[in-house]
Amino acid sequence: MAAILAASVVANATAAPVETVVGPGWANNSVNAVVFRKNSLVSDRDTQYVGYYDAERYLVLGKRKLGSTHWTVHRTQYQGNAADAHNAISLMLDGAGTLHVAWDHHNNALRYARSVTPGALELGPQQAMVGKDEESVSYPEFYRLPDGRLLFFYRLGGSGRGDLVINRYDPASATWTRLHTNLITGEGKRNAYWQAFLDHRGTLHVSWVWRESPDVASNHDLAYARSRDGGVTWETSTGKPYVLPISAASAEYALRIPQNSELINQTSMAADADGRPYIASYWRDAGSSVPQYRVVYRDAQGWQMRNLGFRHTTFSLSGQGTKRIPIARPQIMVSLEAERPGAVLVFRDEERGSKVSVARTSNIADGKWQVSDLTKASVGSWEPSFDTELWRRSGVLSLFVQDVRQVDGEGQAAVAAQPVRVLDWHPEQ
C-alpha cells in the first residue's frame, strides 16, 4: 500500500516555449488531442513527424528538420471516423526509419499502414499485422525498443470486457509477430486501461486501472507489471515472475482505489535512473469532492503516493463515451537524477483558463511543486501528448497542441478547423 503525502504548490515563471504551426486540423472534438496518442509526434536524430486529421477527416502527415519552423505536409489517401474521439492516430519510427501509422480505432478492424520508404510521408496499402484477433481494436500504441524493433499494444474487445494484445515488429524482416494475445485479462468481466513506458535501460513498465463496466465510474485500483526482455516475460516491482495472463487476482497493486472515486483511466507513467516507476493520474479521496492530480511511485520502502493538492473545483466522472472533463489527463516526465529525481507534470485545468500548464519539482519525494503556464490562451479540451523519442534523447519536451472542443459523450462542436501546433520547451531553461 502506498504511503501518502500532500504536496505543496507555488506559482513560478517559466521560460517560453518555441511554437511552430503545422496546418489546420479537425477541432470538432478532441480526437487529435487525446492523451493516449503513442505517438502524436515522433523523431529520429534529424527529422520530426506529426499526424492529425484535417477538417475533412483525412489522415495528414507532416515532417520537419528538428529546429526548423517549416513543415512539409501530406494529406494521405486515408480517412477516419474523427467524429468518435477514441479514434486517434498513433505514429512511430522503427530502427530502419520507416514510419508506422495506426488510426481510426474504437472496437473495429485494424487500420494500419507504413511509409513506402524510410523518410517518406506517403503511406503504402492498409494491411494486417499478424492477421488474427484484429477485428475489434481500440487504443493502438507503438513503443520503440532500443534495438529498433517496435511493440504494438491494443485492446481486443470492448470496454469492461477487453484484453491487452502485444505484437512485435522486426525491421530486418519487415514482419509482425504476436507476443501476447492476452497479457492482462479481464476474464470476460472487466478490462485493464493501461499506460506504458519504455525506460532508458529498455525495461518496459505497464500500469493500469480496472474497469468493471462501460461506465467510467467503475474504474478502480492501480496495478503494475514490468518486462526486462522486450515484453516477452513479465514480473512485479520486486522481481516476482507473473504467470500470464495477469488477472485481477494475480496483479501487484500499487494502490487500492475504490470505484466511484473519479479515478481516470489512460494517463501516463515514467521511470527514473534506477528504473523505478512513476505513475501520474487523478482521483478524489473519500470525504472530498475535488479530484486531485497524484503521482504514485516505487522506492526502497515500497509504493508511495504524492497528492499535488492544488485543485479546488469539483466534478464527477460517470457514464459512457468520451467525457467533457474540466481537466486533462496528465503526462509525466521524470529526470534521471539518481539520488533526487525531479519531474514535470503537463496538464490542462479550467481553473487556470484551460491553458497548457506544467507542475515541476526538483525532488518528487519532498512534495514541493511549482505550477506555471506554457500558453497564454485556452486550448479547449486538449490533452498532452509528446515526442517520446526527442525527450529521451535530448530532454526537449515537444508537445502536440491544438485548441479543440469536446461535447460530452460523442457529440461534435460546431467549430472551424484550428491550427495544429508544436510547442518545444526545455524544462531546465
Predicted regions and their residues:
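Gram-negative bacterial Sec-dependent N-terminal signal peptides
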Residues: 1-10
